Amino acid sequence: MLRTHTSRYIKCICQTIKIASFCLIFLSIFSAATAETTGSGEMKVTLLGTGSPVPSNERFSQSILIEVEKQKLLFDLGRGVTIRLAQLDIPFRDITASFITHMHSDHLVGLPDLWLTGWLPTGFASRTNPMVIYGPRGTIAMTDDLTKAFSEDIRIRLADEKLPPKGIEFEAHDIGAGLVYQKDGVKVSAFETHHGDLIKPNFGYVVEYKGKKVVISSDTTYDERIAETARNADLLIHEVAIIDPKLLKAYPRFKEIAAHHSSPEDAGRIFSIAKPKLAVFTHIIVLKEQGPLDVSTEEVVARTRKMYSGPLAVGHDLMQFEIAEDVRVLDRSETH
């Protein structure tokens, strides 16, 4: 009787393994199919997180995905980056490289999640190579410290699950301004922007491929270096802050927040100089005395229009743009 039960049990396990293997094969095929998201010469940009440090289920923290051919490049890794990637059916192992604008936590808290979860032996993870990351001074030190902080988890999984050691390593780079990444015709360059006198270095990024150009401002005050860098760009992604004047009077600390960011009018001036094919708002900071802490599209557009009359979009999470001969917004509900 024991042998019969054991035999049935083994057969059940084998059937389960066969099903699991089939699922993994299916996921691999599906991932390969979804990886072909762009055609020759095209770029796809997805706003994964368009919010601020304030927790929101509508707007996760800052993160942008740029897909070029088979490369998937992440810019900042804010809160919820793994959730947004999962919503797009993008396996975490498929991220080619990540780029950090500056060392503020709201741009980084998703890094440990993507790093650790991306190593797990699942259909959406299973990274076998080091996680490649570029960022300002302190990036290498941060990745070393993360490895120490999670050393027990790493030790346990190496021993218990026999996960590939290379998959939990970092290939980290402390960068300066200039060309920081080049692969198969894709170029990523960093340039400094002003987020505050003590927040240095603070990098914006330029992504170029076959004559197409996407510029990311990073967190910034009014800075004409952004306008010069983004002249005639296909897509200029810029931050914006809307702070109730009453709060500025009542809470002097909020003046410091305002002094580190761009108003809609500031951004509009940058857009009017740069003249991109499309200007897009992200990292949207809203501080109000009353009402929901979410952007009033009408207000941000009206204030921007005082300085800029060109194509404009107010970003939201999972908003996508395809860049070929023209810039196509896949969700036009927030274009103006």
Regions found by a protein language model. Give the residues of each.
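N-terminal secretory signal peptides that target proteins for export/translocation
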Residues: M1-Q15
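A polyampholytic, Gly/Pro-enriched intrinsically disordered region
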Residues: L330-H336
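Bacterial N-terminal signal peptides
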Residues: T16-I29
